[in-house]
């Protein structure tokens, strides 16, 4: 019931789902509703261990494996190295000989990889988020790769008629042009608590936030000149300029 259906096709799961609607849901500030690779791989691995799988399980596994094959990323690798002052730095770099990887999260609109910081705003590049989240979270993984051989055996045994052709050696979605890895994000104004226009007070917007907000209070500042003195006297305030 929670497996995401897109254009009539079963795909994968979100990291968390709403307990009432069963739709993809948010958890921590940087865990947004998404197609999630690693968690979905764990689900598929479990489903393939069930004896005598029924038609629903077969469809779920076939659908997820097709998604894993379609949206794998190739020619890339996640590099962790000592950056400035010895602080670990994580980057996504070219890796022609590397095996396929998957982003932790793919957005629900374009099915394209993204990363996120504690401000809850998705971004396309690791270097666009802070050091703490960039290095303290697994943004890319190879967990689904472990399923491909297992799936071939499972499908041949239980449902060869509907077996999906999958391969770790074919080009990924990024190299085939199915996705745009670094699509410039369109600012979603509905994602912000307050939008400030030129001539309006940024301070007034800040003071609309709770004194101790439990979630980031996001303020979008539209393009313009703001000759204002601002005092941020409460935590979890996120100021974002219109790009």
Model segments located where?
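Hydrophobic pocket-lining residues that define ligand/cofactor binding sites across diverse proteins
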Residues: 1, 68, 209
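Active-site cradle of extracellular carbohydrate-active enzymes
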Residues: 1-34
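Terminal, non-catalytic domain-edge segments
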Residues: 20-24, 31, 35-161
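Extended hydrophobic secondary-structure segments that form protein cores and membrane-embedded regions
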Residues: 66, 219-222
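Extracellular "leader-to-stem" segments immediately downstream of a signal peptide or signal-anchor
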Residues: 161-218, 231, 238, 243
């Amino acid at each position: 019931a929670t497996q995401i259906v897109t254009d009539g096709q079963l795909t994968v799961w979100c990291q968390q789902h709403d307990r009432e609607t069963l739709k993809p849901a948010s958890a921590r500030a940087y865990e947004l509703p998404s197609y999630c690779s690693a968690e979905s791989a764990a689900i598929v691995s479990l489903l393939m261990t069930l004896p005598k799988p029924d038609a629903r399980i077969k469809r779920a596994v076939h659908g997820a494996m097709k998604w894993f094959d379609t949206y794998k990323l190739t020619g890339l690798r996640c590099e962790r190295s000592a950056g400035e002052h010895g602080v670990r730095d994580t980057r996504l770099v070219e890796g022609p000989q590397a095996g396929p990887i998957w982003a932790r999260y793919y957005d629900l609109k374009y099915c394209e990889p993204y990363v996120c910081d504690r401000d809850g705003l998705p971004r396309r590049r690791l270097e666009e988020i802070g050091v703490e989240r960039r290095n303290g979270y697994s943004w890319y993984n190879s967990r689904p790769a472990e399923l491909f051989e297992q799936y071939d055996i499972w499908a041949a045994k239980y449902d060869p008629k509907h077996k999906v052709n999958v391969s770790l050696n074919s080009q990924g979605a990024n190299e085939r042009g199915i996705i745009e890895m670094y699509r410039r994000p369109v600012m979603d104004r509905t994602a912000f608590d307050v939008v400030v226009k030129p001539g309006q007070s940024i301070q007034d917007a800040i003071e609309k936030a709770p004194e101790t907000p439990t979630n980031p209070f996001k303020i979008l500042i539209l393009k313009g000149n703001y000759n204002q003195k601002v005092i941020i006297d409460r935590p979890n305030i996120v100021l974002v300029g219109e790009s």
